[in-house]
């Protein structure tokens, strides 16, 4: 039997992904041990795991280096890869929003400098230029995006919000919600056809596990 390869996102999704796979009977012992190995295995079920930067997971899955992946919907929207998004796993839930000073509430069509700061340039551009039909300048940031409106770099930001506390502490509010975000199970298109006898039982087992929660 050939191995199935699963790519997991490093960081906040790792523990929740491991818990889910263990709940359906997949051995994740090697994943839980702090090992320097890059590829970890469940020999009994013939499954290989590797941890990757979240933004790289869709790439590994699209090109078939991984058959299955777990990644946030925000990453899928930003990366725009060709793969199957088969399950909403429900965990790591948050929202992708447009945020800015409270005085801009209801006035997104009247921005003066038309600059939007974000870690998600594709999502920001899609929202403003396609949904709102507005021409904007997107400024890509890698750090604390909330800082941008405070120092005059941009009028608004596009970012993930969980509790909204960070926005509130910085005098910002949610101006619009772009999408509900959570972890998703994704599958390579060729693997879905060629390895369906291995992949479909995993999808079904995860679906049943989620229904119990």
Swiss-Prot record:
Location relative to the cell: Cytoplasm
Catalyses which reaction(s): 1-(5-phospho-beta-D-ribosyl)-ATP + diphosphate = 5-phospho-alpha-D-ribose 1-diphosphate + ATP
GO cellular component term of the entry, any: cytoplasm
Location, primary (coarse class): cytoplasm
Molecular functions (GO terms): ATP binding; ATP phosphoribosyltransferase activity
InterPro entries: ATP_PRibTrfase_cat, ATP_PRibTrfase_CS, ATP_PRibTrfase_HisG, ATP_PRibTrfase_HisG_short
Pathway terms, separated by semicolons: Amino-acid biosynthesis; L-histidine biosynthesis; L-histidine from 5-phospho-alpha-D-ribose 1-diphosphate: step 1/9
Keyword vocabulary terms for this entry: Amino-acid biosynthesis, ATP-binding, Cytoplasm, Glycosyltransferase, Histidine biosynthesis, Nucleotide-binding, Transferase
UniProt xrefs under Pfam families: HisG
SUPFAM superfamilies noted in UniProt: Periplasmic binding protein-like II
GO biological process, one term: L-histidine biosynthetic process
EC number: 2.4.2.17
Assembly with partners or alone: Heteromultimer composed of HisG and HisZ subunits.
Role summary: Catalyzes the condensation of ATP and 5-phosphoribose 1-diphosphate to form N'-(5'-phosphoribosyl)-ATP (PR-ATP). Has a crucial role in the pathway because the rate of histidine biosynthesis seems to be controlled primarily by regulation of HisG enzymatic activity.
NCBIfam families: hisG
Record-stated family: Belongs to the ATP phosphoribosyltransferase family. Short subfamily.
Entry's free-text remark on domains: Lacks the C-terminal regulatory region which is replaced by HisZ.
Protein name: ATP phosphoribosyltransferase
Organism in which the protein naturally occurs: Acetivibrio thermocellus (strain ATCC 27405 / DSM 1237 / JCM 9322 / NBRC 103400 / NCIMB 10682 / NRRL B-4536 / VPI 7372)
